[in-house]
Amino acid sequence: NYRINNHYREAETKIFGTKVPFRPVLRAGLNCQLADYSFLRASFGQGYRNPSVVEKYLRKDIGGVGVYPNENIRAEKGFNAELGFKQGYKLGNLQGMLDVAGFYTEYKDMIEFQFGLFNNGNNKMINSISDAVEMLLGQGGFGIGAQFHNVSKARIYGMEVSTNGVYNFNKNTKLYYNLGYVYTEPRDADYKERNALEDTYTDPLQMKEKSNNSKYLKYRQKHTFKTTLDFEWKRINLGMNVAWRSKTLAVDYIMLDEREKPNGNPEVMDYVRSLLFGSIDGETLATYWKKHNTDYATVDIRLGVKATKEVAFQFMVNNLLNKEYSSRPMSVAAPRTFMVKMDVTF
């Protein structure tokens, strides 16, 4: 079977005299049953998204970090294609489903946030010495925060493999499982042109797009693996979550610069970062990130007991190995945590 959606609005594309963009999009999908418990699927979809009110107009401070408006932000558009195969299986007391899929997504004017320094008087990012002088002569002061902007072009593609099912030991004893692996290649399609442009920068306060010259988008990881196991025996449940992720590929330039410095000498922005983020016992944000931005694995365990049909208790330990890790600068994950939960159903 197949399904195709295509929408067209036959109306005046103006609201209160303001022109509203008209963007038809095509979406198509195909599902085919090849055999018992064997399915092939394919899909293609175009997308068009106008900036939200938050991205375009909001000015707010959250815990000392500001969100700054950008009225020049443009709508993002793109398309996504996916091809997948799902297969059911049964081996004795074991039964489940295996799913394999490949995906490709392309964006134009992709909307992403960028951290930086801002003039609180005019909500403008400080991007040069003249911007800094304008901020100092004004009365608004400065703030650190994020502003949404457009990335010219981005391509994200990869594959996902997952399986889930159950092993029945007997009527009262079961093992449920869910395993998944995702490989993602998050490409900045214009990174060469951007790097060439940034090499011409002469103003020491001019902001670059990200912390390195790589071809990757910010705040992405290539590899993710997750496993969930739940062993049930009558009213008792013993479960475990295991997750493994690869390192973050790039972050914002305001936080650190991973590029090689000429003659190893610090630049003006290095001193700005020292003033903004400080250090503890000689450990700066950059040195901490270099040490902890690595592949990492976490383990959570839980023990649950269903006392009655209406009342259940669960004891959980998150980050069992007390792993210190960080998926982005200034965001250290919680240490080992113990929790007790009671569920009551009325």
Label each PLM-derived region with a short phrase.
Residues 1-14, 21-27, 163-165, 172-181, ...:
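Surface-exposed extracellular loop regions of Gram-negative outer-membrane beta-barrel proteins
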Residues 93, 101-106, 125-254:
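Gram-negative outer-membrane beta-barrel transporters
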Residues 8-17, 66-71, 145-150, 210-215, ...:
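Extracellular loop and loop/strand-boundary signature of outer-membrane beta-barrel proteins
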Residues 20-24, 77-81, 155-159, 221-225, ...:
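Residues that define the transmembrane beta-barrel architecture of outer-membrane proteins
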Residues 48-49, 106-109, 115, 243-286, ...:
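C-terminal beta-signal and adjacent terminal beta-strands/loops
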Residues 33, 39-43, 74-145, 155-157:
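Membrane-embedded beta-barrel scaffold of Gram-negative outer-membrane proteins
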Residues 2-8, 44-50, 57-59, 87-89, ...:
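Transmembrane beta-strands of outer-membrane beta-barrel pores
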